[in-house]
């Protein structure tokens, strides 16, 4: 628990900054970067989850003063790829990927308050996961349009919010967010053994109209719908 519960290390090979001449600065990150998520799970086992983030053609335009900054971002492709997870010293294959297409939006930070608004034209995902009992699940799907927005008020003087969440909430930490997902379609296949040790398999598909969800977190409590 506490500060050692989880960590995220990000390796960015290159960041290019350019002055646009109108008080704005353009930032372009490397087309590919790596992430390494690690920590301790609820069972007390250490885990490590490496990932690759591909974002070719990305750009971010920043404007304003340091104490009141607005960032406008554009990510033509944003793809997260997982290959494996290590938990309790045991490595397991975890081939998963998630891709957002044509993502644009803004992020604004001023006086300890942060708000963001992001829209994506499409979300795709696929995976092929086999557990320790050799039961396998393959899935793939997509969603048309994805929109997220939210705000966060951050109290001064709280560096590690995970370790000191209670104190942060008492000092004014508050978050809210909404997500809207358009029409969604997915397919899946599974195979394995039944309770008698016999081979079993199946397949299915899902088609939905989409959904909306929202959440809040503040000293008064947590809510979602």
Q: Model segments located where?
A:
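Glycine-rich, small/hydroxylated-residue low-complexity segments
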Residues: 1-225
């Amino acid at each position: 628990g506490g500060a050692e519960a989880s960590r995220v290390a990000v390796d960015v090979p290159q960041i290019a900054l350019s002055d646009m001449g109108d008080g704005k600065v353009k930032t372009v990150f490397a087309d590919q970067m790596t992430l390494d998520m690690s920590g301790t799970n609820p069972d007390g086992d250490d885990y490590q989850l490496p990932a690759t983030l591909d974002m070719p053609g990305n750009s971010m335009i920043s404007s304003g003063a340091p104490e009141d900054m607005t960032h406008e971002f554009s990510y033509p492709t944003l793809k997260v790829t997982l290959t494996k997870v290590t938990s309790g010293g045991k490595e397991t294959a975890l081939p998963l990927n998630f891709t957002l297409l044509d993502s644009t939006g803004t992020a604004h930070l001023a006086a300890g308050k942060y708000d963001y608004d992001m829209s994506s034209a499409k979300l795709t995902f696929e995976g092929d996961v086999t557990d320790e009992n050799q039961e396998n699940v393959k899935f793939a799907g997509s969603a048309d349009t994805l929109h997220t927005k939210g705000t966060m008020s951050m109290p001064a003087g709280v560096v590690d919010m995970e370790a000191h969440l209670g104190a942060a909430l008492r000092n004014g930490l508050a978050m809210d967010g909404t997500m809207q997902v358009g029409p969604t379609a997915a397919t899946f296949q599974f195979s394995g053994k039944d309770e008698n040790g016999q081979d079993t398999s199946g397949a299915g598909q899902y088609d939905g109209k989409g959904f909306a969800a929202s959440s809040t977190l503040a000293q008064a409590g947590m809510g979602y719908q």
